Regions:
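Internal, well-folded beta-alpha domain core
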Residues: 90-178
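Conserved small/polar residues in nucleotide/adenosyl-binding loops
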Residues: 183-185
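Extended amphipathic alpha-helical segments with heptad-repeat/coiled-coil character used for oligomerization
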Residues: 26-92
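Generic structural concept
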Residues: 5, 24-31, 67, 74-77, ...
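Intrinsically disordered or highly flexible coil/loop and linker segments, enriched in small
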Residues: 6, 36-50, 79-86, 107-108, ...
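Short secondary-structure subsegments characteristic of cysteine-rich extracellular domains
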Residues: 3-37
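Non-transmembrane, amphipathic alpha-helical segments
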Residues: 15, 19-29, 54-65, 132, ...
Length: 185
């Protein structure tokens, strides 16, 4: 998770600086990290509930969805739900770190700014609310449709979209595998 966070932060900084090539490299690397994490579930799924119970206490609150690193990744990429901060209230240092992330634009916020600039659009301000979950927005959807309908004209934006979709796919599968494994054990 630490490497994923490092790479996602770097991707965001490169995207802010409009260095798309570097951004693509970082996002691709994070997608590969989650691909490897997904592959690990093939081994972890062989564990029985008693196998898992033998070491679960050693993980403390640092495992899975309670992990502050997991939550940082969620917030950094753009899945921002402030209700999830409550899990970390017992650790003021981690809570402060998570709140600080919510004050930064997410990777998706920055991607929307790039889309807005490149397409010469004016996306609605509510698309850029830092600490709130994204809402469906016709203007944003229309911008992505325009990019996907004309990929050769907007190749770099199309490539950005594809990198984000790839990352989301691996991350979503990791979350799904995590939940299924926990149900099993």
């Amino acid at each position: 998770m630490r490497l994923a966070l490092h790479e996602l932060n770097a991707a965001r900084e490169h995207l802010i600086s409009n260095r798309l090539g570097e951004t693509f490299k970082m996002i691709s690397r994070v997608a590969r990290i989650f691909e490897q994490l997904n592959n690990a579930w093939d081994v972890l799924r062989t564990m029985t509930p008693s196998d898992y119970s033998s070491f679960r206490d050693a993980l403390g609150a640092s495992s899975g969805f309670q992990s502050h690193q997991y939550r940082l990744i969620e917030f950094l990429v753009g899945n921002r739900n402030c209700a999830m901060l409550k899990v970390h209230e017992h650790r003021p240092d981690l809570l402060a770190m998570l709140k600080a992330e919510l004050e930064q634009p997410s990777l998706y916020h920055v991607a929307l700014r790039v889309v807005e600039q490149e397409l010469k659009l004016s996306l609605p301000g509510d698309a850029f609310r830092m600490a709130e979950p994204h809402q469906c927005n016709k203007s944003i959807e229309d911008a992505w449709v325009q990019i996907y309908q004309q990929p050769t004209e907007y190749w770099m934006l199309y490539e950005l979209a594809e990198k984000l979709v790839d990352l989301e796919d691996y991350f979503r599968r990791w979350r799904f595998n995590h939940v299924l494994s926990l149900i099993h054990i």
